[in-house]
């Protein structure tokens, strides 16, 4: 079991968090529907970008539980992807951004660099 069962990954460009309204909405949905509590946290208030990450493209990973969170900042490292494979999976529970990605990782194979997951007819994620 993970200390923080859910996470968000927020792009930071030149010190400014991107798409915070989208991340806030998904965070609030998770708080209400996964943890069964009303959200109190405003991402715009807690995502404070450290001085060493004010330039360029940075990723902010927010791992969270019902009452605690942890922020990690790191430079964005683009991957070289040559081949993609779509995998159609309806049985995976993917209502939230789970920290435990073992079900998604199990979909990877040696035939492609990246797997694109199609869940209930919609592209939902990649590994």
Annotate the PLM regions.
Residues 1-127:
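Helix-start/capping segments and mature chain N-termini
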């Amino acid at each position: 079991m993970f200390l923080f069962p859910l996470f968000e990954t927020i792009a930071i460009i030149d010190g400014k968090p991107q798409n915070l309204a989208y991340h806030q909405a998904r965070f609030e949905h998770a708080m209400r529907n996964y943890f069964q509590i009303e959200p109190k946290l405003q991402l715009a208030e807690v995502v404070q970008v450290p001085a060493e990450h004010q330039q360029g493209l940075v990723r902010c990973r927010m791992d969270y539980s019902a009452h605690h969170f942890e922020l990690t900042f790191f430079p964005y490292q683009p991957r070289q992807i040559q081949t993609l494979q779509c995998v159609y999976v309806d049985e995976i529970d993917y209502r939230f951004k789970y920290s435990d990605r073992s079900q998604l990782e199990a979909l990877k194979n040696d035939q492609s660099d990246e797997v694109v997951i199609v869940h209930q007819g919609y592209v939902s994620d990649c590994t």
